[in-house]
């Protein structure tokens, strides 16, 4: 008899059932692993699968996480180059793609990443036809559109991490300026993740007190306190971090785990994430932009109708036109 047989008496033969709350992360670069560790620390899954094309790196990352199992509450961590390891996932997070180079605009990355998605998405769909897709790779709004087109999924099941991070950065910087924790500082960045994002100044508040009502010049050129700079810092922050350390990882990893928590626990929290906005705010093309969305187990169920100033709406439409200009040129 083996030690196991001497130690344990089996009382019930378990049917081999698959995981119920499985999450897959595609791409084990800095962003993918930051997403993985953030998700593991929040105990969101009963199985975590990692996929990448670089097999040594992939196995190394898996082993490194498995060796920390004692300190985690996720019983199964698996990995593979073959997408069969992703089978029965509830949520699939796509972080794979060509990395943004210093000074390179997010939009420049597009076609390089479309070609990668043409391989990834059909494989994900094959093994998890009922999953939700969360796209993180940049340029995220265009690649969310690409994932939606290739997958054939309904639009509520394909989301982009979008402005969830931009809004978090905004709230952090707002908190630094006011000496208040970012949880108590409210403000929304919508539109394109990145260079043409739109700050909704009318909604910026602390404890329901509108900063714009207190100080009408907020966010305008006449603003002596330079609040407009806060938004500029949000836009520049990724470029600054890339310049300093070569890539961004921790903040986006935490932001993605925040979205994963809302989905896996069906919290129905409102997040500024990338969704199909055709028919909203005068947008007439098939583009994905960030607007406040009610998110849960089924994906996006509702969109909050924000009251925007005409110039804010104009900026959104301009973003949509820019994105559509690029999307219509893409080779699928």
UniProtKB/Swiss-Prot annotation:
PROSITE patterns: L_LDH
Listed name of the protein: L-lactate dehydrogenase A chain
GO cellular component: cytoplasm
Binding site for substrate: 106, 138, 169, 248
Record-listed E.C. numbers: 1.1.1.27
Record keywords, A-Z: Cytoplasm, NAD, Oxidoreductase
Functional description taken from the UniProt entry: Interconverts simultaneously and stereospecifically pyruvate and lactate with concomitant interconversion of NADH and NAD(+).
Quaternary structure annotation from Swiss-Prot or TrEMBL: Homotetramer.
Similarity comment: Belongs to the LDH/MDH superfamily. LDH family.
InterPro entries xrefs: L-lactate/malate_DH, L-lactate_DH, L-lactate_DH_AS, Lactate/malate_DH_C, Lactate/malate_DH_N, Lactate_DH/Glyco_Ohase_4_C, NAD(P)-bd_dom_sf
One GO BP annotation of this record: lactate metabolic process
Binding locations of NAD(+): 29-57, 99, 138
GO molecular-function term, one example from the UniProt record: L-lactate dehydrogenase activity
Pathway where it operates: Fermentation; pyruvate fermentation to lactate; (S)-lactate from pyruvate: step 1/1
Pfam families registered for this protein in UniProt: Ldh_1_C (PF02866), Ldh_1_N (PF00056)
Annotated gene: LDHA
Locations listed in the record: Cytoplasm
Active-site residues per Swiss-Prot or TrEMBL entry: 193
Catalytically driven reaction(s): (S)-lactate + NAD(+) = pyruvate + NADH + H(+)
């Amino acid at each position: 008899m083996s030690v196991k047989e001497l130690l344990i008496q089996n009382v019930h033969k378990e049917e081999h059932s698959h995981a119920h709350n499985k999450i897959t992360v595609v791409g084990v670069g800095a962003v993918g692993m930051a997403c993985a560790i953030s998700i593991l620390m929040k105990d969101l899954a009963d199985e975590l699968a990692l996929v990448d094309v670089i097999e040594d790196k992939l196995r190394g990352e898996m082993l490194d996480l498995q060796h920390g199992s004692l300190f985690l509450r996720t019983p199964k961590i698996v990995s593979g180059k073959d997408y069969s390891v992703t089978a029965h996932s509830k949520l699939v997070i796509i972080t794979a793609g060509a990395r943004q180079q210093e000074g390179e605009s997010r939009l420049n990355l597009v076609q390089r990443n479309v070609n990668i998605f043409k391989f990834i998405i059909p494989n994900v769909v094959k093994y998890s036809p009922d999953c939700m897709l969360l796209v993180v790779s940049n340029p995220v709004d265009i690649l969310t559109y690409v994932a939606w087109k290739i997958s054939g999924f309904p639009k509520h099941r394909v989301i982009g991490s979008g402005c969830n991070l931009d809004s978090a950065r905004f709230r952090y910087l707002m908190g630094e300026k006011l000496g208040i924790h970012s949880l108590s500082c409210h403000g929304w960045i919508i539109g394109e993740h990145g260079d043409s994002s739109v700050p909704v100044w009318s909604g910026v508040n602390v404890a329901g007190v509108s900063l714009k009502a207190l100080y009408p010049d907020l966010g305008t050129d006449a603003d002596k306190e330079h609040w407009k700079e806060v938004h500029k810092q949000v836009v520049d922050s990724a470029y600054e971090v890339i310049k300093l350390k070569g890539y961004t990882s921790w903040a986006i990893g935490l932001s993605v785990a925040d979205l994963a928590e809302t989905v896996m626990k069906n919290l129905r929290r409102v997040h500024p994430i990338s969704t199909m906005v055709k028919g909203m705010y005068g947008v007439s093309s098939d583009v994905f932009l960030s607007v406040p969305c009610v998110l849960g187990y089924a994906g996006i169920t509702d969109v909050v109708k924000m009251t925007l100033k005409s110039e804010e709406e104009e900026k959104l439409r301009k973003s949509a036109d820019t994105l559509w200009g690029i999307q219509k040129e893409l080779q699928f």
